[in-house]
Amino acid sequence: MKALILVGGFGTRLRPLTLTMPKPLVEFGNKRMILHQIEALAAAGVTDIVLAVNYRPEIMEKYLAEYEKQFGINITISIESEPLGTAGPLKLAEDVLRKDDTPFFVLNSDVTCEYPFKELAAFHKAHGDEGTIVVTKVEEPSKYGVVVHKPNHPSRIDRFVEKPVQFVGNRINAGLYIFNPSVIDRVELRPTSIEQETFPAMVRDGQLHSFDLEGFWMDIGQPKDFLTGTCLYLSSLTKKGSKELAPTTLPYIHGGNVLIDPSAKIGKNCRIGPNVTIGPNVVVGDGVRLQRCVLLEGSKVKDHAWVKSTIVGWNSTVGKWARLENVTVLGDDVTIGDEIYVNGGSILPHKTIKANVDVPAIIM
C-alpha cells in the first residue's frame, strides 16, 4: 500500500519552534511528529510513503533516510514549487500513488490520534466506493465543518455543513483518508482544496463514506493544542499500560502521565506531573515543579523553578525560582533569568529574558 502525508509549508502556527526545525521533525511525546505517522503506516503494511513538502526539504532527508532503513519502506519527498493546498499534492505524486491499483492513505501531518489504518483499509474495501474519510466526534460541532450522512445509511456522506448554527451532527473531518487511485482523475495540478472541491464532487456521485475514529484525536499544529495533544497522547499510553511512562511509584511523580527520556537527569525533591514530557539530555534541578509541559532535548530547568503549560525549546534554560505558565513557548537556545515570571507568549530563538513578561507577548 501507499500513503501521502501532507506536510505543507512554514509551520507558522507552531512558531517559534518551527523557526529552527520543520514542523514534522519537532518532537511530540519524545518522538518526531512524522515518526508517529510513519510507524503506524508501516505497521499497517504501507511500503511507499510520499511527503508533500514546500519548506526546507533538505533538513528532512537525513531523518527520512534513517526511517527508510528502520522500517524497510520507500519514502519520497514531493517538492511543491508553490503551495498546492490539500488536493494538488495528490496529482503531483501521481507516479507513486498510481504505481498499482491498490488504495492509498492521505493524512495531515498535524494530526495525532490512535491511527486506525488497518481497520480503515478493511472498511474501505468492504464498501467498495472511491473514498473514505475518518471522522471524529466533538462536543462543540458549531466550531467545525460537520459531516452529515444520507438518511438510513450509516456511512455514506450526504453533505458537509460548515459551522452549523443548528445541530445537524457531531462528526467532523479528522484529516485522515483512504482513496482508490481513480480519485486522482478528479484533481488538477494546481492549488486546490480536497475539502472544498474534491469531496463535494465525490459526495454528488455517492462515492464518499465516513469511518468513525475510536480514541483520542487532536490537531497539534499550534502550541495550546500541542500541549493538549500531549496530554491526550500520554493518557492513551497510560490506558495501554505502556512501560515507556515513568512509574507512578517514583517519589517525584505526581498524577502520572509522565514520559522521561533515560538520558535526562532529575534533581532532588522535584514534583513532576501530571502530563509532562522530558526529552533527551534534559537537566532538571532540585525542587522543580513541572506540570502539563514539554521539555525538549538539551534544555535545562534550574532549582525551584515552576513550569506549567509551557514548551521549553531545545537547549533553552529556565533560571532558578523562575515561573513559566499560560502557554509559554521558548524557541531554541532561549535563556530565562533567575526569578523571572513569564505569563504566556512566544520567545524567539537565542533570546535572553531579564525582565518579567506579565502579559502574553511575542518577544523577538
From Swiss-Prot:
A GO molecular-function descriptor: GTP binding
UniProt keyword list: Cell cycle, Cytoplasm, GTP-binding, Nucleotide-binding, Nucleotidyltransferase, Transferase
Cellular component aspect of the GO annotation: cytoplasm
InterPro entries for this protein: GMPPB_C, GMPPB_N, Hexapep_transf_CS, Mannose-1P_guanyltransferase, NTP_transferase_dom, Nucleotide-diphossugar_trans
Class in the EC hierarchy, top level: transferase
Pathway: Nucleotide-sugar biosynthesis; GDP-alpha-D-mannose biosynthesis; GDP-alpha-D-mannose from alpha-D-mannose 1-phosphate (GTP route): step 1/1
Locations listed in the record: Cytoplasm
Example of a GO biological process term: cell wall mannoprotein biosynthetic process
Enzymatic reactions: alpha-D-mannose 1-phosphate + GTP + H(+) = GDP-alpha-D-mannose + diphosphate
Entry-linked Pfam families: GMPPB_C (PF25087), NTP_transferase (PF00483)
EC number: 2.7.7.13
Main function: Involved in cell wall synthesis where it is required for glycosylation. Involved in cell cycle progression through cell-size checkpoint.
Protein family (similarity comment): Belongs to the transferase hexapeptide repeat family.
Full protein name: Mannose-1-phosphate guanyltransferase
Biological classification of the source: Eukaryota, Fungi, Dikarya, Ascomycota, Pezizomycotina
